[in-house]
């Protein structure tokens, strides 16, 4: 398949630049895979779409304030973007560095509160290994001085409100540099209402990486190499998923990150084993889903791997018809936008 088959026209004014005042005040498009029906309800109405015996799987990753602004000792402005921590080393991170001159080993960047960032050596891809001194209490320092890593299509600087709103209400495990955005619509009250319908809620963790924003640089999908993201499935969640499937309930993924995690971990019969690993599965039309029965997701960028995943789940023709309806009805797109429930 060609990447160009997943392009569509999106008026720029439909890209949500701010979250709504209330998380669950967004709109929800409903997409029925069997009958092809497309509808619209307030997101709060999602409660009525659940059935007793369903299982809602959420991603409890927590976004770190990964953007740091500083100056080189020579005075030049420098932006450091934390990508991921080097395993076993609390002081050294894989980072992207933006400055007037290309980075080189030994360069020191002066950061707030006397912290220094020293460029060590090239990492993988476009990253550099950077050590932060003093490293003790680094996470607390980062919470005070880092900025939330808003996606590039949000054309403004992150502000104090984004520290709360670009984070799900169930975020627990630090490590993501982008939010699992389908979860941004959920409130504690909504989750309680869903549980009150006889629905279980179970977490997985997938630390969303920068690869979620990376464009596909090949013409054919089959030639694309997917990025890797760390995931963890607790034993209780694996048991809940396997029990739900045995009892005839639906496994409902809250977001593409949950979907990728479960499909990465699933055996051929859909059984899920607890554990951790790296998800590098690339899902596009033709893929047969083993673990996920319904999907809640936002609207995704043209020609993105996430759009291809959702096309595989809904069927490309139905999904693009739904996207056409969403544009015509002036839905809000991307991270701070509206959502759809595909079942």
Curated annotation (Swiss-Prot):
Listed InterPro entries: QueA, QueA_dom1, QueA_dom2, QueA_sf
Catalytic activity from the UniProt record: 7-aminomethyl-7-carbaguanosine(34) in tRNA + S-adenosyl-L-methionine = epoxyqueuosine(34) in tRNA + adenine + L-methionine + 2 H(+)
Keyword Signal applies: no
Pathway(s) per entry: tRNA modification; tRNA-queuosine biosynthesis
Main localization, broad class: cytoplasm
One GO cellular component term noted in the UniProt record for this chain: cytoplasm
SUPFAM superfamilies: QueA-like (SSF111337)
Pfam families found in the cross-reference section: Queuosine_synth
Keywords attached to this entry: Cytoplasm, Queuosine biosynthesis, S-adenosyl-L-methionine, Transferase
Disulfide bonds: none
UniProt GO MF annotations: S-adenosylmethionine:tRNA ribosyltransferase-isomerase activity
Superkingdom of the source species: Bacteria
EC number(s) per entry: 2.4.99.17
BP GO terms, sorted: queuosine biosynthetic process; tRNA wobble guanine modification
HAMAP family, A to Z: QueA (MF_00113)
Record's function text: Transfers and isomerizes the ribose moiety from AdoMet to the 7-aminomethyl group of 7-deazaguanine (preQ1-tRNA) to give epoxyqueuosine (oQ-tRNA).
Protein family per UniProt: Belongs to the QueA family.
SUBUNIT field: Monomer.
The protein, known as: S-adenosylmethionine:tRNA ribosyltransferase-isomerase
Native source organism of the sequence: Geobacter sulfurreducens (strain ATCC 51573 / DSM 12127 / PCA)
